[in-house]
């Protein structure tokens, strides 16, 4: 029963992240929601699966996958956001703090 809590947590984060991707106004806020959805949701699901499975070999593979996702997903999201910004996609905010630092 306890192993279902991380699964439920992961599913809820995935649901609310998908809702944010649909509802948010621009690419940056949508990317933020998608990143949280991917990182948090997948981590919860993988942790829940690692608690359910009985094989140590499969648990080890799941933990390696979890570490890989935790390292790679923020870098990919940053690259997408930077590419969108350099490509001229303007954020729908009143003050662009990034433009002040990088003229």
Swiss-Prot record:
InterPro entries of this UniProt entry? PhaG_MnhG_YufB (IPR005133)
Q: Which GO terms describe its molecular function?
A: sodium:proton antiporter activity
* Top-level division of the source organism's lineage: Archaea
Q: What Pfam families does the record tag this protein with?
A: PhaG_MnhG_YufB
Q: Which family does it belong to?
A: Belongs to the UPF0091 family.
Q: Which NCBIfam families match?
A: CPA3_mnhG_phaG, PRK12675.1
Identification of the protein by name: UPF0091 protein PH0944
């Amino acid at each position: 029963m306890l192993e279902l809590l991380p699964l439920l947590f992961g599913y809820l984060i995935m649901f609310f992240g998908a809702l944010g991707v649909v509802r948010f106004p621009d690419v940056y806020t949508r990317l933020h929601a998608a990143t949280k959805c991917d990182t948090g949701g997948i981590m919860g699901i993988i942790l829940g699966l690692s608690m359910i499975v009985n094989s140590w070999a499969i648990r080890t593979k799941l933990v390696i996958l979890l570490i890989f996702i935790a390292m790679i997903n923020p870098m990919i999201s940053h690259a997408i956001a930077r590419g969108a910004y350099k490509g001229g996609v303007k954020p729908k905010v009143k003050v662009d703090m990034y433009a002040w630092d990088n003229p």
